[in-house]
C-alpha cells in the first residue's frame, strides 16, 4: 500500500473537495483503470483484507473497540446505533406491493442523509480531542467508550434543521467530502437497490479517513501497520455489513448492477 499521511483536520481540508463525477464513457473508465487513484484504492482495500491473516489481533465481539483509534471508535458507535435502532424505528411497509425495494427504505436513507454530518463531526471531534491534541498512539478503553457513545448519540439524535450545511470553510470541505462517501455506502434511495458500488463507497470513505490520519497517530511517511488495520477490518467492516444485511433483508433492496463495481 502506498504511504498514507497522518495529519489533522486542517491538513485534510487543504486536500478536500466535494466529490465530482468524472466517469461517463468507456474511455473515461479505461483512464480510471490505469490511474493512481484506482491503484491506491485497490491497494488499500487489499491491504485491509490481508491484515486479518496471521495477525496477533484477536477480534472479540464483546469488546469491539479494542485496537481502534478514537475517531474510529466514534464511527463504530454510530454504526452500532444505526444497526440496532433504525430498522426497528422505520420498519418496512407491509402493505407495499412491490417486487423489489420497500418504499420505507426512502425514509431510512433520508435519516442517513439528515444525520450523516453529525456522525462525521463526532468522528473528527474525537480525533482532534484525543489524537491531535494529546499526540497519543494508544488510548484506554474509557476514552474509546466515550467516543463510541458520542458516535452513537450522533446517529440517534435528529439533526438540527437550522444548523448550516454545505459551507465552504476548510472544515466544511472535509465534512462535505466524507459525507458524500458515507451516504452513498448504503444503497440508492430512488432505485431502491444495493450493490458493489455502494460497498466500494464505504471503503472509499475508510480510505479517506486513513488519508487524513483518522486511523491513529502515526508518522506521515509510514503506512498503517497490520496491527492497526486488523481491528478496522474486523470491527468496523463487521458492523457495516450488519447494517447492509439488515436493509437488504428488511427492505428487500434490488441487487444493483450486473458488472461489478467497475
Segments from the language model and where they lie:
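Polyanionic, low-complexity segments and short acidic motifs
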Residues: 38, 217-226
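Well-ordered alpha-helical scaffold segments within catalytic/enzyme domains
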Residues: 205-216
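N-terminal leader regions that mediate targeting or early regulatory function
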Residues: 1-184, 189-194, 198-199, 230, ...
Amino acid at each position: 500500500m502506498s504511504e498514507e499521511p497522518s495529519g489533522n483536520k486542517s491538513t485534510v481540508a487543504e486536500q478536500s473537495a466535494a466529490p465530482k463525477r468524472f466517469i461517463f464513457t468507456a474511455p473515461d473508465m479505461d483512464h480510471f483503470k490505469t490511474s493512481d487513484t484506482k491503484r491506491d484504492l485497490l491497494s488499500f482495500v487489499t491491504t485491509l483484507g490481508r491484515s486479518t491473516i496471521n495477525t496477533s489481533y484477536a477480534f472479540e465481539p464483546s469488546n469491539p473497540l479494542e485496537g481502534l483509534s478514537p475517531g474510529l471508535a466514534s464511527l463504530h458507535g454510530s454504526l452500532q446505533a444505526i444497526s440496532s435502532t433504525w430498522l426497528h424505528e422505520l420498519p418496512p411497509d407491509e402493505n407495499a406491493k412491490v417486487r423489489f425495494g420497500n418504499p420505507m427504505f426512502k425514509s431510512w436513507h433520508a435519516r442517513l442523509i439528515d444525520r450523516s454530518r453529525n456522525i462525521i463531526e463526532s468522528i473528527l471531534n474525537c480525533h482532534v480531542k484525543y489524537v491531535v491534541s494529546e499526540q497519543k498512539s494508544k488510548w484506554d478503553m474509557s476514552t474509546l467508550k466515550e467516543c463510541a457513545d458520542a458516535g452513537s448519540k450522533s446517529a440517534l439524535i435528529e439533526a438540527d434543521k437550522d444548523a448550516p450545511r454545505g459551507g465552504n470553510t476548510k472544515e466544511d470541505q472535509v465534512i462535505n467530502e466524507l459525507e458524500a462517501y458515507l451516504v452513498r455506502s448504503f444503497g440508492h434511495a430512488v432505485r431502491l437497490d444495493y450493490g458493489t458500488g455502494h460497498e466500494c463507497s464505504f471503503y472509499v470513505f475508510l480510505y479517506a479517513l486513513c488519508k487524513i490520519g483518522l486511523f491513529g497517530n502515526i508518522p506521515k511517511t509510514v503506512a498503517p501497520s497490520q496491527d492497526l488495520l486488523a481491528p478496522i477490518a474486523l470491527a468496523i467492516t463487521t458492523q457495516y455489513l450488519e447494517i447492509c444485511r439488515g436493509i437488504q433483508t428488511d427492505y428487500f433492496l434490488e441487487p444493483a448492477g450486473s458488472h461489478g463495481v467497475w
